[in-house]
Amino acid sequence: MFSNFIIYLLCFNSLFLLISTEQGAQKNIFDETNLKHLKLKNRFFRGSVGDNSFKNGKITEEGFKLYDQLSKNEVSNIFTGYTTVSDYNQFENVNVFRIDKDEYIPEFKKLVDLVHKNGANIFMQLVHIGMNTKMKVDTVYGPSSLPLQGLNKMSKEMTKEDILRIENDFAEAALRAKKAGFDGVEIHAAHFYLISEFLNPLSNKRTDE
């Protein structure tokens, strides 16, 4: 299902270390390299940055212009800004990318085709916001039940069923990204979003498995 597709976990700068420590002759940032099957024309990456390019389920004209310019400027690989896999209503910024439904695949395919036409690769960054929300919604999911800053309420400690649901949301989002033609996905596991909350003992007080 995910053959010839790269899945990368954003926790530390492991990917950048990987492509800068090859065996053999010393390389520089302008040299070509490979990441598994993926050919990189140099070691310049555009990191994941929110760019407000998505409105009402569509990529804006300014968004297409931005990615067109980025991919023309000799960047070998572009990471999108964070793209929500589910619970979109918990994002304060309503203009974040969404991949929680199949209906968004055609729009992203247009973006991918544009970037590929200009000779660059593109990865989609996937995220679940977890407790890092400012929105007053009924349920805010987290690894443990903790006070939510500025919301005067507690997060909901996720059940095993909740965990399996969101695991599946990530898997389905990655599959949609692949169908849209992305070269891979970056799983956001930093900056106090859901996955990093599970990795952090300050936010994960669970005693189960």
Model-derived features: positions:
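Glycine-rich tight-turn/loop motif centered on a GG-T
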Residues: 90-106, 135-165, 195-209
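N-terminal capping/small domains of soluble enzymes
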Residues: 21-127, 155, 166, 174
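Feature marks short, surface-exposed loop/turn motifs that line or immediately flank catalytic pockets
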Residues: 52-53, 84-86, 130-132, 191-193, ...
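Cleavable N-terminal signal peptides of Sec/SRP-targeted secreted and luminal proteins
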Residues: 4-18
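Non-globular sequence segments
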Residues: 113-116, 121, 127-182
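Short beta-strand segments at enzyme active-site cores
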Residues: 78-82, 122-126, 180-194
